[in-house]
């Protein structure tokens, strides 16, 4: 085809990336793409915003199953919904793409950057950017904010909506029966 081949340029040429993952459907196409480019994602599940706990467990278990099926490492950050509530206090009524989203992204990506720093991983990125409901600008701002505290960690600003990945994500979602499709397109 004439379509320009989708190129992945990892900061510093890292071959291992800490991937903050919001859920299996969003991460599947990204993980597949990384692996095709010989980049190994270490999956970091840090989503204290998900409520109730049952929903959190369902999503976490799906991510874990998916990671294990590919032989990938998955790290479960502790579920701390109370801490999350404290962080977004007073912003509960904010709309999608509002101030609460930015604060939530910052909290989750700061945790991701901290884990990367403590475990010798030099690059982080997130599957949050795959959803067209989220603001790419907010996600990138949160990623830069998160890595500012850790000079040894770089935030990889990759637009995961390009290169046919959105279509691939939808195809994977259709092929794999995920339980919480209601949260997606």
Predicted regions and their residues:
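Conserved small/polar residues in nucleotide/adenosyl-binding loops
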Residues: 179-185
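ATP-dependent adenylation/nucleotidyltransferase module used to activate substrates
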Residues: 1-163
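Short, surface-exposed amphipathic charged segments that create phosphate/polyanion-binding patches used
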Residues: 88-95, 167-177
